[in-house]
């Protein structure tokens, strides 16, 4: 093994630099980018070639810098890296790692650092020192083979010893997965996720079905899985590779919001990804049709229609260019959504087919009802709001839409007040915890996230469905612009026949993050032409247009309307709540954002920094989400003596940090888009204690931190459905592609 030693001369121009090996313990992480995996770390190199141990004892004085795609290497982890030395004009000598693998450290200091890094649950820095002091270089052998001896260490009882042993065993399995993935650039956290998904079958899946990694493990893309597949000998034109490429192209379309693709476009995208001729791709599509992984439907003569029904359109074997291809879950979800909405909307007329609310309100004198709302509850509704109330209580399915400040919540209060006065069971929900909490505050009634309401479980299973529907006569869902096809289908399946469904939302907001622009599609189907009800709509739509909230003096409301109408926003003059500050460069814009949050807005308006949310259109760049989070954390919540920290997935968390959940975690019952604040760090257990904005408190184990990120700055899409006292948004020329209406 080549230790660091004196750095070799940098190879001259045109020469291939000699590959070297470097082994040591990561002492600290100087920089890391979780999105790209690029990191800069300081390494204490090991000498394992018989040289005196005294040289190793001086390692603190001869740390070396390692740069490269290092995933989420944590302080204390031992790594073996291959690469070469380079003399950077600005930063000096660095080891550029082209690949690496993590190993167990062999030195006493390395063992202490490793055990105390949070990788082993139940062991913090203090207990790590005690364990290694007790067992010395035999520490890992003791934990591995005689974990019962851990109770010999002061402060460690049987319960903690058992927890340490269990975590160590799991880490051993993860290291075995890492060994199978050596040279493929897979980080430790990804290996842990692979093991969590496949367990003892991980090595078999990697060796025989590597493309499953891309489909079933969050954070592993097709290119990584393809690299592994090619390394184990899967041919470029192998059927499994071609089919995996087609599925990846459809999954990419879903990430962009599309539930299906025309076949020619699908083939073209797959060819570009796989670098193969289109002939083989057509066979791959047919094979996926036969297996049921995808579903085909003919392209209608007009605009694309819905996918086939859940019973399935027979796979088309002709080569008509208009064939549409969808991943089976999306095709079935859209078909199921359409069929269930038709069934719910069909509960009209009289008798048993009529809903409970319709039976009650069909004979109501609405002038009396609205007068009662005004006199008894001080709810004085505008005519368009009255139309929304009538629709919600007489039609089985109705939509209520409008921009910010147009009185949607006020109209909803009228609906709920009348419904509850007649004894109807009302259930309220929204897609995110923050939106549900805001709904609850506005209506003074309980509201839940859709995930909790529907009792969603891993794999898309739901506790509430046609066989176990919601106990409700009226189901109200706010922020429906955030509904994707899969979630909307689960929702309508849980609405009992005979209940009313009221969908509330702003069609001018961004579409859902997931595939399927449900609200926009429903509005197109309803063919609503204005604020009043369209007589031919299959379900009534009320669009509120008059602004009631944030009145004439509000620059926010006025500029929102101007932008929506394609007009330039106006700043200055009497407008005192909407400002524009110019910046020459992205770096200057980023510094202006930080100064606004940390100093200027608190000083002028009295906002606390925690009440100010930074939104960025893009993740990358000097004024992107990632860079702004780093700058804002350093300014608002920097490292300081006595403040505990926990590192995970390339990020460092401290009490007071704002955080955001990136994907659904059914074990912790936290979901994509949930926002919160770190309350505390338990270094011994390797846990974060987070207070979510919806009032719940969650303990995050270190293994779950890969799905958490900082939220001093978030993307505009992630903030959908939320409201904040103050918002700062950098808008740069580099964001131009994302700044359309």
Specify the residue positions occupied by each region the protein language model found.
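Accessory, non-ATPase domains that flank or precede helicase/AAA+ motor cores in DNA-metabolism machines
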Residues: 2-304, 309-365
């Amino acid at each position: 093994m080549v230790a660091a030693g004196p750095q070799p001369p940098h190879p001259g121009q045109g020469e291939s630099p000699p590959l070297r090996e470097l082994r040591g313990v990561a002492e600290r992480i100087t920089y890391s980018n979780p999105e790209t995996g690029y990191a800069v770390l300081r390494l204490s190199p090991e000498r394992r070639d018989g040289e005196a141990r005294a040289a190793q004892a001086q390692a603190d004085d001869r740390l070396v810098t390692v740069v490269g795609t290092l995933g989420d290497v944590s302080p204390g982890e031992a790594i073996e890296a291959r690469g070469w030395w380079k003399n950077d004009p600005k930063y000096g000598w660095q080891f550029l790692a082209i690949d690496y693998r993590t190993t167990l450290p062999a030195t006493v200091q390395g063992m202490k650092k490793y055990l105390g890094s949070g990788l082993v649950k139940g062991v913090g820095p203090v207990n790590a020192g005690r364990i290694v002091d007790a067992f010395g270089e035999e520490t890992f052998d003791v934990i591995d083979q005689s974990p019962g001896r851990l109770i010999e260490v002061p402060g460690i009882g049987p319960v903690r010893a058992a927890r340490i042993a269990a975590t160590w065993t799991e880490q051993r399995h993860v290291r075995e997965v890492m060994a199978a993935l050596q040279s493929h650039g897979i980080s430790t956290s990804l290996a842990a996720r692979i093991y969590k998904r496949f367990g003892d079958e991980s090595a078999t899946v990697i060796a025989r079905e590597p493309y499953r990694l891309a489909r079933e493990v969050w954070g592993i893309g097709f290119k990584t899985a393809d690299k592994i597949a090619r390394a184990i000998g899967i041919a470029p034109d192998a059927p499994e590779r071609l089919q995996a490429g087609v599925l990846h192209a459809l999954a990419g379309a879903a990430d962009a919001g599309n539930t299906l693709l025309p076949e020619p476009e699908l083939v073209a995208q797959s060819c570009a990804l796989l670098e193969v001729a289109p002939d083989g791709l057509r066979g791959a599509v047919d094979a996926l049709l036969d297996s049921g992984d995808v579903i085909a439907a003919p392209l209608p003569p007009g605009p694309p229609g819905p996918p086939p029904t859940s019973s399935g359109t027979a796979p088309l074997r002709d080569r008509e260019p208009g064939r549409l291809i969808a991943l089976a879950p999306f095709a079935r979800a859209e078909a199921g959504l359409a069929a269930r909405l038709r069934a719910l909307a069909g509960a009209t007329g009289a008798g048993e087919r009529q809903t409970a609310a319709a039976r009650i309100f069909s004979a109501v004198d609405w002038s009396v009802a609205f007068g009662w709302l005004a006199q008894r509850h001080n709810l004085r509704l505008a005519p368009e709001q009255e139309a929304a109330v009538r629709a919600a209580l007489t039609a089985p399915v109705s939509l209520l839409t409008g921009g910010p400040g147009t009185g949607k919540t006020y109209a909803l209060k009228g609906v709920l007040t009348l419904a509850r006065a007649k004894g109807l069971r009302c259930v309220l929900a929204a897609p995110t915890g923050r939106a549900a909490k805001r709904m609850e505050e506005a209506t003074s009634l309980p509201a839940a996230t859709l995930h909790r309401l529907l009792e969603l479980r891993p794999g898309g299973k739901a506790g509430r469905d046609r066989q176990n529907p919601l106990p409700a006569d009226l189901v109200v869902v706010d922020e429906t612009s955030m509904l994707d096809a899969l979630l909307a289908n689960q929702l309508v399946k849980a609405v009992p026949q005979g209940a009313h469904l009221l969908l509330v939302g702003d069609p001018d907001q961004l579409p859902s993050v997931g595939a399927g622009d449900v609200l926009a599609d429903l509005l197109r189907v309803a063919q609503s032409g204005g604020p009043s009800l369209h007589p031919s709509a299959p379900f009534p739509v009320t669009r509120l247009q008059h602004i009631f909230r944030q009145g004439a003096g509000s620059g926010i409301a006025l500029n929102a309307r101007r932008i929506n109408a394609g007009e330039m926003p106006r700043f200055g003059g009497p407008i005192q709540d909407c400002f524009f500050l110019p910046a020459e460069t992205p770096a200057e814009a980023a510094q202006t954002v930080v100064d606004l949050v940390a100093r200027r807005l608190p000083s002028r308006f009295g906002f606390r920094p925690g009440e100010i949310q930074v939104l960025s259109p893009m993740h990358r760049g000097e004024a992107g989400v990632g860079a702004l989070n780093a700058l804002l954390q350093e300014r608002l919540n920097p490292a300081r003596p006595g403040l505990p920290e926990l590192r995970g997935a390339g990020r460092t968390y401290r009490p007071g940090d704002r955080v955001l959940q990136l994907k659904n975690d059914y074990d912790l019952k936290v979901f994509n888009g949930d926002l919160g604040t770190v309350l505390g760090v338990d270094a011994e257990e390797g846990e974060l204690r987070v207070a979510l904005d919806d009032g719940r408190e969650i303990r995050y184990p270190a293994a779950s931190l890969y799905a958490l990120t900082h939220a001093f700055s978030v993307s505009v899409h992630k903030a959908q459905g939320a409201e904040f006292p103050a918002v700062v948004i950098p808008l740069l020329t580099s964001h131009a592609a994302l700044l359309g209406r």
